[in-house]
Amino acid sequence: MENLKTYTFDEAYKASLNYFAGDELAARVWVNKYAMKDSYGNIYECSPEDMHHRLANEIARIEKKYENPMSAEEIFELLDHFRYIIPAGSPMTGIGNDHQVASLSNCFVIGIDGDGDSYGAIMRLDEEQVQLMKRRGGVGHDLSQIRPKGTPVNNSALTSTGLVPFMERYSNSTREVAQDGRRGALMLSVSIKHPDSEAFIDAKMTEGKVTGANVSVKIDDEFMEAAVADKPYTQKFPIDSSNPLVEKQISAKKLWGKIVHNAWKSAEPGVLFWDTIIRESIPDCYADLGFKTVSTNPCGEIPLCPYDSCRLLSVNLYSYVENPFTKEAKFNFELFKKHVAKAQRIMDDIIDLELEKIDLIMSKIENDPQCDDIKHAEYHLWEKIKSKSSKGRRTGVGITAEGDMIAAMGLRYGTQEATDFSVDVHRTLALAAYRSSVEMAKERGAFEIFSAEREANNPFILRMKEADPQLYEDMLKYGRRNIACLTIAPTGTTSLMTQTTSGIEPVFMPVYKRRRKVNPNDADVHVDFVDEVGDSFEEYIVYHKKFLEWMRVNGIDTEKRYTQEEIDALVAQSPYYKATANDVDWLMKVRKQGAIQKWVDHSISVTVNLPNDVDEALVNKLYVEAWRSGCKGCTIYRDGSRSGVMIAVSKKDKKKADKEKEGATDMPVKPLHNVVEVRPKELECDVVRFQNNKEKWVAFVGLLDGYPYEIFTGLQDDEEGIALPKTVTKGKIIKQIEPDGKRRYDFQFENKRGYKTTVEGLSEKFNPEYWNYAKLISGVLRYRMPIDHVIKLVSSLQLKDQSINTWKNGVERALKKYVVDGTEAKGQVCPVCGHETLVYQEGCLICKNCGASRCG
């Protein structure tokens, strides 16, 4: 590899800040997530312009293999400044990046052909899930093949444990896999026909359970009809068997009520209207050839068959509005159609680039030093993925900035007029993408198993035939390059760089406040807030970029420091008024999703945001309307139903808040615990494992009333360390007094058979220096210092020895899981967006501003 120029973070950030016209958040996101880097963190690109040249050159290299190639310059113009076409994160990071051996695919689904109801099959999926996640992919798989709890099995267990233990296994595997500083993404699904579906639905209601996965229930029309009409419904296993091993009748209405309640309470499970998905699915016309859809990717926008994958790309809808925010605003449909055709072509090129990446992955596996027995499973996994990718050539062309497009056209998101316009745009997109796929079939050949006869009665194809008969005739004649083409995904950090609304969603808030820490002694500093430790903060207004554009177009001063009342008045004048995520008419949003879904061959990822005070009846109404409207899935989020998420504040709460103590924030209530001077003889204990300079360590956290009271740490699996089975996660710490009066602490746990095992003398297992620091930390825990303050104290310890610093980090990780969800991480800055908006959630730090997460 040639010696490439490298840049410091500051150099890349400064150049990117200039590129994004001063948008600090966009600049930080790009440098941290998308600039080309090697495994040592060296940065090889100075700004997104470098990245777009890298992408354009690689895509143009593939174009040269085919007729009528696009040039690198033409492709660059489409990508530049994220104006028209934006590949998703994995393609942006991986294309042309020889420093990483990773897939370009955003998402995968895995599964077992035939009988998946065996430990071997379950373990195989666990291994495959991990292997994909380490290459950056999100993974989905279905658990409907696992036999229900209590059914006979031919092993020493005698009866099956059911689905839930395996949900926890797959969830834990996800949490263990690091993908560039974040956890992997996992979707677990199950059919409502399965006798264990109720246990699946309830699994995440237990705090701390299945925290590494999204869960969705595959619901058929028969169940929905039974739930609405309050009729019985039959569950069975195997779910599609005419001669099932297990069969039982349930109240569909009662189980549906549980789905609604859990979604209202915790935003999960999501619902997948499976009959609609299968009925509309073009790939399922080839189900007998391996394209039977079994689950979805983690966000739900791509239903997939086992070992298929998808790469995503978005078209920036705002960029096609001419004279935005004026009476002359017009959508340029002709330019849009041309660009969608090129976007579909670029997506097909990216499939070829992905096949090259898969070859590199397989070559690396072959050359890895491990024995062939170990490497075989991973190698075979990529063989299967390569086969499906080349056979179907599936793409995921989508959109972003729908909310801004609607506002720029002078329409209000959530109205019938705006929905009708959006449907026109998505119909145009679908026809242009399919036209492009047919044209490529002429030039490059159709996907390997194309059959017009198989697809003849597919509802999506029939809609295309009615809308554009000539396109349909050409498809019969030439075929199609791609088995399926379209999706609408959540665009997340990508929309931060387009500086637009995300995906199909409305704007979250057009104007909001942020705080930055300031030195009160500096000149011209305005202190708006002082926290409990005395740090000073200045509040400043952040405008959504396109709202700022509306202000400019209408001659409104964008530099003035406005009062809250003035800001409210400005928003009321704008097309964003009553069109935010929390304002839009919920039923209209669901109906809009259903109307647009008719022109999207995969699915749509969209969330219906609800205020905290809505009841379960509304959630029920929205879900039923989603089913009737033709949605393939539906997700709701009730404000405050999950901790660690940005909470919206209503105006009626504002007056009440203003009267309260200055600086008070809407924080979770921290539990108050009495100080217990005399340690009980026995304490419940959690076991937490971590790495310390490549050594395996274990922490024992003694708990009093469920709250950390003391901590012990030591080496694990060492002759001088602590021998402990990996399955042990809980036990007791027992205080003993020896004959000479010395105190000793023992750890006791129960093995799988219920027998107690005691590890004596925890304190003897420690390096004296570690032991002294552990005693210090235990002291502040004993006197009930809040856990987040203890973590801050531990992190502030100035230790010279690298090994003990690493140990200190492990102690922090062990304690984070006890911080109350939603607690703010005072004084800590998000490494992605640079703002002090981090909160603790399930032991991880989550940024309320940009959604970045950091565990450990």
For each of these PLM feature ranges, what is it?
Residues 75-76, 236-238, 339-386, 390, ...:
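Internal maturation/activation junctions in enzymes
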Residues 36, 58-65, 78-155, 163-166, ...:
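Function-dense linear segments that define catalytic or interfacial modules
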Residues 830-833, 847-850:
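Short cysteine-rich clusters marking metal-coordination/redox-active sites
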Residues 219, 280, 285-290, 297, ...:
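Terminal amphipathic helices with adjacent charged low-complexity linkers/tails
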Residues 472-474, 650-701:
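Short, Gly/Pro- and small/polar-rich lid/capping loops
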Residues 2-69, 73, 155-169, 179-291, ...:
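Conserved, charged catalytic cores of large soluble enzymes
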Residues 836-838, 853-854:
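Cys/His-rich microdomains that often coordinate metals
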Residues 24, 300-302, 354, 461, ...:
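Catalytic alpha/beta core of large soluble enzyme barrels
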